[in-house]
């Protein structure tokens, strides 16, 4: 691998990975009074270069996706994200955070909440997402949905719903080509978003 190809590869991976990452912020775009439900699928897009790059490559509206779960009576969002440690030495993994943080103004300038048409299916998916979070699964930097030991953001949501017997992405996948490299069968946020089983609850 020559140096030019190495640089291009590293830049591409960083752009795709960082689109699923975020920084801490005190303000949020989440509307006051919005009631979330178990299994809700939440989308966001930021204003940074990485978000725009992924949206351009994806052809969709959003660059990141997560799923709402119930944690001891409190609604939280589970999502797979790199480069956002919760403590020194933390590794890139599936994590859980508050809706306000997920939709912080540092992470997002637009967002959307979608809900599955079947409440029971959504509840099963939420429980599976919580289980995956508790397993401490690593973030999948290879974006390989054939590797069940690691997950990236869209793959996590798809896998949670598969546990309930439902595929949100169905057969929709994206291939990415950069000089010297080819990424195949990647589930992007738009592949989840286009599911006919999801209905918009709020767009902001």
Describe each PLM feature range.
Residues 46, 69, 81, 117, ...:
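Sec/Tat-exported extracytoplasmic proteins
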């Amino acid at each position: 691998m020559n140096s030019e190809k190495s640089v291009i590869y590293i830049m591409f991976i960083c752009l795709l990975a960082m689109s699923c990452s975020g920084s801490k912020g005190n303000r949020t775009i989440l509307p006051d009074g919005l009631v979330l439900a178990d299994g809700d699928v939440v989308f966001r897009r930021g204003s940074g270069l990485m978000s725009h790059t992924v949206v351009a490559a994806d052809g969709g509206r959003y660059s990141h996706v997560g799923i709402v779960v119930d944690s001891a009576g409190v609604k939280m969002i589970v999502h797979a994200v790199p480069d956002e440690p919760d403590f020194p030495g933390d590794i890139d993994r599936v994590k859980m955070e508050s809706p306000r943080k997920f939709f912080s103004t540092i992470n997002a300038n637009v967002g959307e909440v979608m809900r599955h048409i079947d409440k029971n299916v959504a509840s099963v998916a939420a429980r599976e997402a919580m289980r995956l979070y508790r397993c401490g699964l690593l973030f999948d930097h290879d974006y390989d949905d054939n590797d069940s030991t690691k997950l990236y953001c869209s793959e996590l949501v798809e896998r949670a719903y598969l546990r309930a017997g439902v595929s949100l992405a169905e057969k929709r996948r994206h291939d990415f080509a950069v000089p010297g490299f080819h990424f195949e069968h990647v589930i992007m946020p738009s592949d989840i978003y286009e599911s006919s089983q999801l209905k918009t609850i709020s767009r902001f």
